[in-house]
Amino acid sequence: MEIGISKYRNIGIMAHIDAGKTTTTERILFYTGKQNRIGEVHDGAASMDWMEQEKERGITITSAATTCFWNDHRVNIIDTPGHVDFTIEVERSLRVLDGAVAVFDGVAGVEPQSETVWRQADKYSVPRICFVNKMDRIGANFYRCVDMIKTKLGAAPLVIHLPIGSEKDFKGIIDLISMKAIIWQEETLGAKFSYEDIPSDLLDKAQEYRNLLLDAAAEMDDEAMNTYFESNDLPVDLLKKCVRNGTIKGKFVPVLCGSAFKNKGVQPLLDGVVDFLPSPIDVDVIVGIDPKDSEKKIEVKPSEKEKFVALAFKVMTDKFVGSLTFIRIYSGKLKSKSTVSNALKNETEGIGRMLLMHANNREDITEARAGDIVALVGLKKTTTGDTLCSVDFPILLERMEFPEPVIEIAVEPKTTSDQEKLGIALNRLVAEDPSLRMSVNAESGQTILKGMGELHLEIIVDRMKREFNVEANVGAPQVAYRETITKSVEIDYTHKKQSGGAGQFAKVKIKFEPLEPGSGFQFESKIVGGAIPKEYIPGVENGLELIKEGGIISGFPLIDFKATLLDGAFHEVDSSPLAFELAAKGAFKEMANKAGPKMLEPIMKVEIITPEEYMGDVMGDINSRRGNVADMLDLGNNSKIITASVPLANMFGYINVLRSMSQGRAQYSMHFSCYEQVPQYVVDELKLEYN
């Protein structure tokens, strides 16, 4: 069925782990007719969770993409993981979406990962609507949840639905736009519902919230403002138009509610997606740059009549078709069997098959156009973040930024015959997941895997076994420590070597200085007047790039410093890029102990939800882990949220300690916050361990 681009909705479903994202998606697929039975996460039958590990653990690891239809609109949905170790999946999904549905647990409200995901959506200016889920659960409180959206996320919630009843008495919702109650029929699994008059005991509250809705909506449009002044009301179509405008401009976020598991509130949520979230033509124009001239900006218009431009946002291996590259098409058309250009790599790629994905089921298609999200089979050189475009229209879209890993493990094959298979498996997995890094320890020869958390690496090792049949021995997780300097120093260094034949000569004067946390390594050359020929200067930068990886104190990479090449000298015969590389390394070694080197460790932001009676034990334990409690919040229901900063080194295996301390009733999540200096007594212990 041919649907115009104005009726496309490319959306993501995002939330904290266990807020009910995948269940909500399953209901959407059921009610839009994509599935004829409902899959449940706790049965391991959810169709969007298709990896074996997802079915076993009941969590979503990769972003599954699917397409469905609602009220003559085409809705492309990406279901994203809520576990903090898989934040990268959320990041790359948000990069290619036009709108999002943020799902909140009606009991817990705004949880740590909800904040992380919300910040990511802010970064890409993704308009969103909120769905307060699990309104049937004990302790569910819609109004507290709305308040948390305001206070914890700094958002402007605009209430569209009110719940009728709560916990086991949750029956349906009041739609403030139509001012009707919607009640679902249990026996039809929520497929049938009726519009009724609002219960008399809720009329005043409904009118109060509708007035707030009208006030906010009328400000979006002059015509609406005039109508509102004259009649103190707005017609439904104009009210929807105003809410849509405000949502797309980011002025407010509509808040809806329901219980996906109990089949209530999902159809109005779909209406909200269609009514309030943008189509590809409603969002800001995408701007790229000319690969040959980064100053030259190129606008990409969302029309199939324009040249083809797309972004590859995910690469994965499928056991039936091989490598799959997911792309979002921003303009133009793409036909299977055609040739496109990878602008970043300056290579052409042949398009083999083109697939429309439903979780891991696939449907072959021959053409896709602006607004579509499709998977391509057989691309050889394209990786996550690359731009694909017409061969005669070179353009680069903004690349995605991926976080640095904070934890590492050593892996080695159990048998020597598995060595080659291990290499193939890891190369495939690293190609799929930009937050996974692989390197080989020069001294031990061990393969080192770096990732975003224990669960992340655990699942990678599990996938090596299941998908590639590689059994590996895995070392204990290690913290990704870093080193930095605290003082500025200038070093004059001359590298001279004379042995029969051509010698080596290079002289450098380099200023080393500390930078703000998070700055990484910066290099600048201030050479003027040819003191060092310009073809030798990259040798200096390369030497520093290589030697900084070995650090100063205990062999960890040196970060957050700047090296400025101030002066130097060369020899007509004996100088070379290699000589200047060696001179730079010599200057670095001389700087090492003069610049006040310090060790840094990753600090995690930890949020713990615990029953009140275990508060004392939990806080005492946090203090014993060198943690600092930053905040405590009362959740009601005899529960508290504790927010703390704790060194990652002291958080391994924490879940088991927390469970035994709270008889399994407390839960926690954590994400990387920053690098901080390691106390001296810990440095002394680490020196013994690592040297």
Swiss-Prot record:
Q: Where in the cell is it found?
A: Cytoplasm
Domain tr-type G per the UniProt entry, residue ranges: 6-281
- Keyword field: Cytoplasm, Elongation factor, GTP-binding, Nucleotide-binding, Protein biosynthesis
InterPro entries membership = EF-G-like_DII, EFG_II, EFG_III, EFG_III/V, EFG_IV, EFG_V, EFG_V-like, G_TR_CS
Keyword GTP-binding in the entry? The reply is yes
GO terms for cellular component:
cytoplasm
Can the keyword GTP-binding be found in this entry's annotation?
Answer: yes
Binding-site positions, GTP: 15-22, 79-83, 133-136
Main location (coarse class): cytoplasm
Task: Tell me which domain of life the UniProt entry assigns to the organism this sequence originates from.
Answer: Bacteria
Alphabetized PANTHER family for the sequence: RIBOSOME-RELEASING FACTOR 2, MITOCHONDRIAL (PTHR43261:SF1), TRANSLATION ELONGATION FACTOR G-RELATED (PTHR43261)
Which family does the record assign?
Answer: Belongs to the TRAFAC class translation factor GTPase superfamily. Classic translation factor GTPase family. EF-G/EF-2 subfamily.
In its UniProt entry, what is this protein called? Answer: Elongation factor G
Q: Which organism is it from?
A: Wolbachia sp. subsp. Drosophila simulans (strain wRi)
